[in-house]
Amino acid sequence: MKIRHRLAGVGLMVSILGCTFPAWAGEWIQGENGQWVYEENQELLKGWNRIDGIWYCLDTETGVWIEKPSMTSEAACRLLENKLLEMGMYRDEEEPLQFKVDYENTQMIQVSVGYEDKPDVFHRINTYEIDKRKGTADPVVGEKEFSLR
């Protein structure tokens, strides 16, 4: 009887261990040319990706990290989110923050930070004017402008 229990236990362990798959965690890899890429599950990530809670812009063709991306409306929202997180702002909000582009022209992008508590009901916490050329954000309410790059 004891032998059957041991064999059953050994059989269970073998089946559990035999059915496990390696977990591929993501990792930053520096190429010979010094450029960085991020690989996850043996594939290069491309475009905008949140890695460990921070947004990174990775080239859409090569996956190479773009340290200072062009200031598009998407870049403005992602970089503003990174900076506000770094500054420790808006951490106690009950709802997830949203970043919405209100207005854009050739020189600036106006981004509102807020949340929705019901569908289509956006509560604005603050608005930031992003200078495309300088890469800075100037809050409508609060401190002076700060760099996003």
Regions found by a protein language model. Give the residues of each.
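Solvent-exposed, acidic/flexible segments
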Residues: 51, 69-77, 104-106, 121-123
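Exposed beta-strand-loop-beta-strand "reactive/processing" segments of non-cytosolic proteins
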Residues: 92-132
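Short, non-transmembrane alpha-helical segments in secretory-pathway proteins
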Residues: 68-100
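Extracellular adhesion/carbohydrate-binding repeat motifs centered on closely spaced tryptophans
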Residues: 2-74
